């Protein structure tokens, strides 16, 4: 288990979390991606800089941090899993599955819907009408094959989106970016079998 943190977790907290887990937990400090940025943020009262940087991390930087793994299972700290196939990676491998999600989601953030499609049209070769279809995976709990995201063309596309100042300014989340890339690559987004969370 990997627990990414912003350098704000004490040794006592790490020890406590580790003592409550049957699995070994590797704590990785990713505070380098959460430094102060001087940009005028739209809707700053709703979404602070840290939230926007968390979205950036989860759409782009994470793939460099997990490059030595074949698969990842992302579970945000607010997720409680009640029923789940513990052999999901083996299932994905034997069935050549790239991506599982807990549920689908539309992008409901107005500023993202107003600005991201236009940015994609101007800065990528994506068929925006086809890929920005609101058939996106909800990203608080998913499993994915890492090498899909480590592909140089996919990483380049993610970099173009994630490292744009507009991602921070307008609070583009990882849902439409992850979903849009999967749609662009024509990767089927599947629902986890036998999941309750």
Q: What are the functions of these language-model segments?
A:
Residues 12-13, 17-69:
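Active-site-proximal specificity loops/subdomain of glycosyltransferases
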Residues 8-9, 32-34, 78-80, 106, ...:
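Conserved beta-strand elements of beta-rich interaction domains across eukaryotes
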Residues 7-14, 109:
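Short, charged/polar "capping" segments at the starts of alpha-helices
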Residues 1-6:
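Short internal beta-strands
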Residues 102-104, 188-196:
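Catalytic beta-strand/loop signature of glycosyltransferases that borders the donor
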Residues 42-55, 79-179, 184:
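Conserved catalytic core of nucleotide-sugar-dependent glycosyltransferases
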Residues 15-23, 72, 86-94:
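Short, surface-exposed basic-aromatic patches at helix termini and helix-loop junctions that form
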Residues 68-82:
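Short beta-strand-to-loop acidic/aromatic patch adjacent to the donor-nucleotide binding site
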């Amino acid at each position: 288990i990997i627990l990414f943190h912003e350098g704000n977790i004490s040794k006592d907290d790490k020890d406590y979390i580790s003592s409550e887990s049957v699995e070994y937990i590797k704590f990785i400090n990713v505070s380098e991606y959460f430094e102060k940025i001087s940009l005028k943020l739209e809707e700053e009262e709703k979404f602070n800089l840290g939230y926007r940087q968390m979205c950036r991390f989860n759409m782009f930087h994470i793939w460099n941090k997990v490059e030595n793994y074949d698969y990842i299972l992302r579970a945000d700290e607010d997720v409680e899993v009640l029923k789940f196939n513990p052999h999901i990676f083996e299932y994905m491998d034997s069935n050549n599955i790239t991506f599982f999600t807990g549920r689908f989601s539309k992008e409901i953030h107005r500023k993202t819907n107003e600005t991201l499609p236009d940015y994609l049209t101007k800065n990528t070769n994506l068929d925006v009408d086809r890929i920005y279809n609101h058939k996106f995976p909800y990203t608080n709990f998913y499993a994915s094959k890492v090498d899909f995201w480590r592909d140089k063309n996919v990483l380049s596309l993610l970099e173009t989106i994630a490292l744009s100042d507009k991602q921070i300014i307008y609070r583009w989340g990882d849902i439409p970016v992850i979903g849009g890339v999967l749609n662009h690559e024509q990767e089927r987004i599947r629902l986890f079998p036998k999941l309750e969370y």
